[in-house]
């Protein structure tokens, strides 16, 4: 599958998307550039599909990609939040878990911005 380079090496691009997916899971809505949001969408949807499966192998696959960050006041991390809170919401839904909303251009460089959030 073709992907945008976003002006980064492949390792930096992977690190960027790991951070963005983790932030999306924790906050459930993030603001980023339109191109990053479009590239992030299939990755985030894959994580939700794995979380819906719910088995140990799926949990390990998600944990290998998502950063280990505290997601809430109880000290639960992002992987736990994805499996316990977000995935059950989409139990009856087959794909289309995220939505991209266009925002105005960024101040400074006028880059087109967008919000990506869970439906």
Swiss-Prot record:
GO biological process assignments: translation
The keyword Protease is assigned to this record: no
Highest taxon above the source species: Bacteria
Keyword check for Ribonucleoprotein: yes
The protein's assembly and partners: Part of the 50S ribosomal subunit. Contacts protein L32.
Similarity remark: Belongs to the bacterial ribosomal protein bL17 family.
Protein name: Large ribosomal subunit protein bL17
Protein species of origin: Brevibacillus brevis (strain 47 / JCM 6285 / NBRC 100599)
Gene name linked to the record: rplQ
């Amino acid at each position: 599958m073709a992907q945008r380079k976003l002006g980064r090496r492949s390792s930096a691009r992977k690190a960027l998307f790991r951070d963005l997916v983790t932030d999306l899971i924790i906050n459930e809505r993030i603001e980023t550039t339109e191109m990053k949001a479009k590239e992030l969408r299939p990755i985030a949807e894959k994580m939700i599909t794995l979380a819906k499966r719910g088995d140990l192998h799926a949990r390990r696959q998600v944990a290998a990609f998502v950063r280990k960050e505290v997601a809430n006041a109880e000290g639960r991390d992002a992987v736990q939040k994805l499996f316990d809170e977000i995935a059950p919401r989409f139990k009856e839904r087959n794909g289309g878990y995220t939505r991209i909303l266009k925002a105005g251009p960024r101040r400074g460089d006028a880059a087109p911005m967008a919000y990506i959030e869970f439906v």
